Amino acid sequence: MCYADSRPGQKHKSFEEVCRAIDTLVAAEGQPDVLQLSGGEPTLHPDFERILEYALKQPIHYVMINTNGIRLSNDQALVDAIALHKNRVEIYLQMDGCDDDVFQVLRGQRLLETKLRAIERLGSADLNITLVATLQAGVNESQLGKLLNLAAGKPWISGLSLQPATYSGRYFTPEQLESRITAPDCIRLLCEQSSGELTEDDFFPLPCAHPNCHVLSLCYRHEGKLVPLTRFVDAASNRDLLANGLSFTRDEGKRLAQLYLARNNCCGPNGCSTNDANNNCSSDSTSQSPAQTSAQTTAQAAGPLVVLDKNPAALADEFFAKAIEKQIGSKQMLRITITSFLDAYNFDVRRVMKCCTHHVLPSGHIIPFCAYNVLYRNGHVPLPDLKHPLVSDIATRNQPQ
């Protein structure tokens, strides 16, 4: 299974080509939120470490490495080299389930031991991981609860990404279209397999994209448990705070917490501080914020995910105080995302027009992810001429060796 149709016998892009693509992204975005190095398998590129170093010299918040983890499970030197940049690198690790039969069907090998070894090796190096599962009906839809438990138990796993199978590239099986897994299926399965600890109300669309493309749930880690932020945050009324990104630095976390508290009248006259978060919005306050009210009304049905011996309003105060103190980072959160990619059978121009995930090509083109996979990757449609002069200039200039 590979939407990129990767296979033996193909060639790597040169170091110079990859650098041109990175420069194109920076020129277009200024300070990109995330750059993902993908493939094929990027860790097999002969210049992989040079490419990573080049990317990290650019004004990019985070660099993700999209990998099957096989090399990382065995190559400590490579893990150590990546770990030098652990504050700006995240491993986007292919992890389709917690049973070997799943890997045998989807990947042609029994890879569970290899994957678990990679997870432990990366955790020992203090590298953050997002587990990425491709979901196929009849194969691994029963694995979501196991993956959630795996992620919840290891604080260096900062994300769980669920991706229903896309019928393009090296996974073209139209006879299985009737059993396609959808984003609502994923939400239902997560709720069922977490024994109701997650609820449908814990999920909301990622604002930067079309609502049918990305669904998100953010969970706060507290005393070994996960607490969805929706238990004490009014996400529906504040989605615009997440409008331009998905990955947040501690500085950005502080800024967002202050904005949220200010909107909900939780701050003092001089703005939001740690004391304001604790005092103005504490459980002892006679005038509670909307966040606290939401926390109290949902806690009764929250299940064992929520710490039951702690006042939910106090839990909200704790979270916001830590965020303002810049103590909320990747290891204090778990990000659950559901991404529904497009193929020829469900292609939707409206979704493509709202896409916030793009392929960046050495030619200077920046193309919506699914449009590239469906239309341009295999040459079904020729790439359009470049019209932006800055991008055109970057695409044609030489890169230093």
Task: State what each model feature region is.
Residues 124-330:
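Radical SAM enzyme [4Fe-4S]-AdoMet core and its adjacent flexible, acidic
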Residues 9-10, 235-239, 375-378:
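A short local loop/turn or secondary-structure capping micro-motif enriched for an aromatic residue
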Residues 41:
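Conserved G/P- and acidic residue-centered "switch" motifs that form tight phosphate/ATP-binding loops
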Residues 11-14, 104-108, 172-175:
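Short, solvent-exposed loop/turn segments at secondary-structure boundaries
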Residues 1-4, 268-276, 280-283, 349, ...:
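Local cysteine-cluster metal-coordination motifs and their immediate loop/turn environment
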Residues 315-401:
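C-terminal target-recognition/interaction regions appended to catalytic cores
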Residues 19-36, 45-164:
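Radical SAM/AdoMet-radical enzyme domain recognition
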Residues 1-16:
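Canonical Radical SAM [4Fe-4S] cluster-binding loop centered on the CxxxCxxC motif
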